[in-house]
Regions:
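Periplasmic peptidoglycan-binding/tethering modules of Gram-negative envelope proteins
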Residues: 2-108
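Periplasmic OmpA-like peptidoglycan-binding domain that tethers envelope proteins to the cell wall
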Residues: 104, 110-180
């Protein structure tokens, strides 16, 4: 669990980058993309993905300029159907997000919880609220000041993609953050 494995420069013209990361023992690798004045973005590449000896595409990570009122999805903070439990992967990413927030003390955020359209709309609204509050509590445990955070669930009212497949539904069970 080292803090920084590699730092790399991104091509200013097209935004492309490549990295070779060598480890003695297979372990999960967190890829964080940072740029001053831009939103947090990261992805976790599991040791299973790394041990496949295939080239890994870091899932089209991009940094977006921070704008008040705009929603940003925290990659890989996804949930199982009807669950508000934070997976180990989600907790790992939230620790990195907490670090980002502590480095950017001026930011106040609204944490938004979302669900797919499976089940009852009222239950989904309550579930999404529990998800958002669970993320807020975790960030507070990681040292982010409570007064900088608020949390709200939106249920199934704001899908990111149509709920037409299991893959899409998984993407809609997500957490976004909005700059206040």
């Amino acid at each position: 669990n080292s803090d920084v494995v590699e730092k790399m420069r991104v091509n200013g013209n097209d935004g492309k980058y490549a990295a070779v990361i060598k480890t003695d023992d297979p372990q999960d690798v967190m890829v964080n993309i940072k740029k001053e004045g831009h939103a947090f973005n990261s992805t976790l590449i599991t040791k299973e993905e790394l041990s496949s000896n295939k080239s890994i595409n870091a899932k089209d990570l991009a940094v977006k300029e921070l704008k008040e009122g705009e929603a940003y999805t925290i990659n890989d903070i996804l949930y199982a159907t009807a669950s508000d439990e934070l997976s180990d992967r989600a907790q790992f990413i939230l620790r990195q997000f907490a670090r980002f927030l502590k480095e950017n003390e001026e930011l106040e955020i609204l944490i938004q919880g979302h669900t797919d359209n499976e089940g009852n709309a009222a239950k989904n609204l309550a579930l999404s609220d529990r998800r958002a509050k669970k993320v807020k509590q975790y960030l507070i445990q990681m040292g982010v000041a409570e007064e900088r955070l608020s949390a709200k669930g939106y249920g199934q009212t704001q899908p990111k993609v149509p709920n037409t497949s299991e893959t899409n539904k998984a993407q809609n069970r997500r957490t976004d953050f909005v700059i206040k």
